[in-house]
């Protein structure tokens, strides 16, 4: 009996695991590399915001991976050994300058900031350190000094994922030889510095492409913007035309996700990012299960091809044309008009363009007005604090009460240990 129970439990766990696993096709290593900024940006340079790519050396990547945050001194001026001996303080415990091993990168960053007017936004190959903006004085990605950049990069879990887990849940490319197929490819890490532009978050959109078909799109910001509903058709046509002209046939993979920005007056479209067709990419207002099961024009055409073949038999009597049979049933004068109308409607449906779904947050959607919950809040505080805040004032009060009990108990233990000395 116990054996049967454990066996049924194992089957249930296996079934749950299969339900939770999304039906993604295998994600090859090459797809992740194709979505790296350094790979696609040179091809689409004219349609992307102004940016500079700085190749990163191994010492700099090691600096990003290292525990702790040690920043270079803000201003370093060369000094002679005599000066150092004269003004050195033997008692001072100064941190070593980490930029000594990557001075060239440090200099390139400073010159790029100056070139772009004193303000840039950083990202690594795939991710921007958006989860670390709480460390910034401006509470955004705006950086004015190299140290602003280093602080964001070293504080970001997103950047850590780029460094440590870029090929999670991926498979080797089938074109590679068996000898080297299991080895993960080397990643040429780059620091991307974009000229800082104060984007209107309401006009940033995420678009999903499957089999080189623009399947659906949605707004990126999790707030309701009433004016977007009046612009939906205009924005959709702009995005579709942009995709058809620039991305449909030029990106190496048939499945991918791209982000774009369409500033007023909604004539120019900017490509902001390209993301993997993978669970790691946030589907935002959709779910991945929903996207993976959507039908696109290719799928609809295949379904129509399986339908029974229909035909029309015609009788030619001089100049008169008589319909004798449509789809195997004889047509009459009374029925021919409705059939012709039906056929006309069907032709209209076939000729009508496929419109990708454009999802916006409505006024009464639960997601609306997400400014009450800060984005990436789980990266800022202990999870217990975040979870307690989501349950409302009661949950937070309960958490604070428990926290005070823990502190009081800790103080009592400290007092008792001191008295026992």
Curated annotation (Swiss-Prot):
Residues 79-98, 336-352 have a biased composition (Acidic residues). The keyword ATP-binding applies. Keywords: ATP-binding, Chaperone, Cytoplasm, Magnesium, Metal-binding, Nucleotide-binding. One of its GO terms (molecular function) is ATP binding. GO terms for cellular component: cytoplasm. Its main location: cytoplasm. Mg(2+) binds at residues 273, 275. It is found in: Cytoplasm. Pfam families: D123. Residues 7-17 have a biased composition (Low complexity). ATP binds at residues 123, 126, 128, 130, 194-195, 204, 206, 220, 259, 273, 275. GO terms for biological process: eukaryotic translation initiation factor 2 complex assembly. Residues 1-23, 70-101, 324-356 are annotated as: Disordered. Belongs to the CDC123 family. ATP-dependent protein-folding chaperone for the eIF2 complex. Binds to the gamma subunit of the eIF2 complex which allows the subunit to assemble with the alpha and beta subunits. PANTHER family: CELL DIVISION CYCLE PROTEIN 123 HOMOLOG, D123 PROTEIN. This is Translation initiation factor eIF2 assembly protein.
């Amino acid at each position: 009996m116990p054996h049967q129970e454990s066996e049924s439990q194992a089957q249930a766990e296996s079934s749950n695991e299969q339900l939770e696993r999304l039906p993604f096709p295998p994600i090859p290593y090459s797809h992740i590399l194709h979505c790296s900024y350094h790979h696609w940006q040179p091809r689409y340079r004219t349609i992307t915001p102004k940016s500079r790519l700085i190749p990163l050396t191994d010492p700099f990547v090691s600096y990003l991976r290292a525990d702790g945050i040690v920043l270079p001194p803000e201003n370093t001026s060369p000094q002679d050994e005599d000066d150092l001996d004269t003004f050195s303080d033997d008692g001072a415990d100064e941190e070593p300058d980490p930029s000594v091993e990557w001075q060239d990168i440090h200099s390139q960053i400073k010159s790029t900031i100056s070139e772009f007017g004193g303000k840039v936004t950083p990202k690594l190959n795939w991710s921007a350190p958006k989860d670390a903006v709480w460390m910034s004085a401006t509470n955004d990605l705006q950086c004015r000094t190299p140290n602003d950049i280093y602080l964001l990069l070293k504080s970001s879990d997103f950047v850590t994922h780029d460094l440590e887990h870029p090929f999670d849940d991926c498979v080797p490319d089938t074109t590679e030889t068996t000898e080297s197929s299991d080895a993960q490819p080397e990643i040429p890490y780059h620091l991307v510095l974009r000229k800082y532009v104060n984007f209107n978050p309401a006009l940033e959109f995420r678009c999903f492409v499957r089999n080189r078909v623009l399947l659906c799109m949605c707004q990126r910001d999790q707030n309701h913007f009433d004016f977007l509903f009046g612009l939906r058709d205009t924005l959709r046509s702009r995005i579709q035309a942009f995709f058809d002209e620039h991305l449909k046939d030029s990106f190496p993979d048939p499945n991918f996700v791209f982000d774009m920005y369409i500033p007023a007056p909604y004539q120019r479209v900017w490509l902001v990012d390209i993301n993997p067709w993978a669970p790691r990419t946030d589907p935002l207002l959709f779910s991945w299960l929903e996207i993976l099961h959507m039908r696109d024009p290719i799928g609809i055409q295949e379904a129509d091809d399986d339908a029974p073949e229909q035909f029309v038999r015609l009788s030619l009597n001089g100049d008169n044309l008589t319909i004798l049979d449509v789809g195997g049933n004889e047509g009459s004068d009374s029925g021919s008009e409705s059939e012709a109308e039906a056929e006309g409607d069907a032709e209209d449906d076939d000729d009508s363009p496929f419109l990708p779904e454009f999802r916006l947050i409505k006024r009464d959607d639960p997601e609306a007005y997400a400014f009450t919950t800060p984005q990436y809040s789980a990266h800022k505080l202990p999870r217990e604090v975040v979870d307690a805040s989501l349950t409302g004032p009661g949950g937070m009060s309960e958490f604070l009460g428990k926290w005070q009990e823990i502190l009081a108990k800790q103080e009592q233990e400290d007092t008792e240990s001191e008295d026992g000395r």
